[in-house]
């Protein structure tokens, strides 16, 4: 397989590492935030990109990305932990070794809480000359003939220790200096809980209260709607009762007209029977009977028309009443809709 020549970026210089740690200190609240959500993650990525821009502004010739400066910081932190562990082992001695768990706990606590600088503006770099002598080729662009990814973040242990030794005291000066210079961002994270951690329960309580209030309003609106529906059903029931009464009245009127018709028919039949009376009497009777029958017919017809007129007037009245009720229900429905929209807002 053809060997590909890939360029690897040069190692971080002293100035780049100094700038990196300074910028991390300025953005410690964002970078070391314990909150886990999309907004915080985006802010962290933006912070690392800003740190990378500040590192690139040093002008060492390399363009670092946010991922690279983050990896550089993690390597620096890991090296400090290893050096602290070695120092503790030397102090304790081989005859009285500390338990591994105690070493890990004390080391993690001190690194996380106390790693840092004495001042944001005055840094005490102890080993810059030695760093330049030991790592003189760090600014050179290295070319490797290999097949792996050129952006691989792994460094060899020896190279890493050489590269990072400039930012911490060496073993020859451990007796003259404190254990470590301190970074402010770590101890504030572990010793003082985030203010938002106290605000979150109150926020959840307020949200639950709002939910309960909205649910209560919804139930009130639902109760009003049911009351309106109940009234509408009552009105509908009353209307049906009136219609039943009207139906019965019309049925009685129909029976009455049937009886009148039968009565007229009997009168006609009786008028056609032969009479033994005199011709004069028959003539007078024949004159008066048709007149009486016609009069009765007209009278019955007039009464029927009057009843029909009354019925139509009653139906018209019922129709107007139903129309008014329909409009009232429409207005009530619109009022409930407006009230519901106001509650939701």
Swiss-Prot record:
Say yes or no: keyword Phosphoprotein present: yes
Sorted alphabetically, the Gene Ontology cellular component annotations on this record are: nucleus
Task: Write the signal peptide boundaries.
Answer: none
InterPro entries, per this entry?
MSANTD4 (IPR026162), Myb_DNA-bind_5 (IPR028002)
Positions of the UniProt region annotated as Disordered: 141-160
* Highest rank taxon of the organism: Eukaryota
Q: Which residues carry this modification: Phosphothreonine?
A: 188
Per the database record, which ranges form the Myb-like domain? 4-77
Claim: Ubl conjugation is one of the keywords in the record: yes
Q: Which Pfam families match?
A: Myb_DNA-bind_5
Q: What are the alphabetically sorted keywords of the record?
A: Coiled coil, Isopeptide bond, Phosphoprotein, Ubl conjugation
Cross-link Glycyl lysine isopeptide (Lys-Gly) (interchain with G-Cter in SUMO2) per UniProt, renumbered positions: 9, 114, 142, 237, 254, 273
Q: Which PANTHER family match?
A: MYB/SANT-LIKE DNA-BINDING DOMAIN-CONTAINING PROTEIN 4, MYB_SANT-LIKE DNA-BINDING DOMAIN-CONTAINING PROTEIN 4
Q: What is this protein called?
A: Myb/SANT-like DNA-binding domain-containing protein 4
State the organism of origin: Bos taurus (Bovine)
Write the gene name.
MSANTD4
């Amino acid at each position: 397989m053809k060997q590909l020549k890939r360029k690897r970026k040069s190692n971080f210089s002293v100035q780049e590492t100094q700038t990196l740690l300074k910028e991390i200190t300025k953005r410690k609240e964002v970078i070391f935030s314990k909150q886990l959500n999309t907004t915080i993650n985006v802010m962290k990525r933006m912070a690392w990109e800003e740190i990378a821009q500040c590192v690139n502004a040093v002008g060492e010739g390399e363009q670092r990305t946010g991922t690279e400066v983050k990896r550089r910081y993690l390597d620096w932190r890991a090296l400090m932990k290893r050096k602290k562990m070695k120092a503790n082992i030397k102090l304790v001695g081989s005859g009285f070794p500390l338990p591994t768990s105690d070493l890990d706990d004390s080391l993690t606590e001190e690194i996380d809480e106390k790693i840092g600088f004495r001042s944001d503006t005055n840094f005490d770099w102890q080993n810059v000359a030695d760093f330049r002598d030991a790592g003189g080729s760090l600014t050179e662009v290295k070319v490797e003939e290999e097949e792996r990814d050129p952006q691989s973040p792994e460094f060899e242990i020896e190279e890493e220790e050489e590269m990072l030794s400039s930012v911490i005291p060496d073993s020859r000066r451990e007796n003259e200096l404190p254990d470590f210079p301190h970074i402010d961002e770590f101890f504030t994270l572990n010793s003082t809980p985030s203010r938002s951690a106290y605000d979150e329960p109150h926020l959840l309580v307020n949200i639950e209260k709002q939910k309960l209030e909205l649910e209560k309003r919804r139930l009130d609106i639902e109760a009003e709607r049911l009351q309106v529906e109940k009234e509408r059903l009552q009105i509908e029931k009353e209307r049906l009762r009136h219609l039943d009464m009207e139906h019965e009245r019309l049925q009685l009127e129909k029976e009455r007209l049937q009886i009148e018709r039968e009565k007229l028919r009997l009168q006609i039949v009786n008028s056609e029977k032969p009479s033994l009376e005199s011709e004069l009497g028959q003539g007078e009777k024949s004159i008066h009977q048709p007149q009486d029958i016609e009069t009765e017919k007209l009278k019955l017809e007039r009464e029927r028309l009057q009843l029909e007129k009354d019925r139509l007037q009653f139906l018209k009245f019922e129709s107007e009443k139903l129309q008014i009720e329909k409009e009232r229900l429409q207005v009530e429905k619109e009022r409930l809709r407006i009230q519901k929209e106001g509650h939701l807002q």
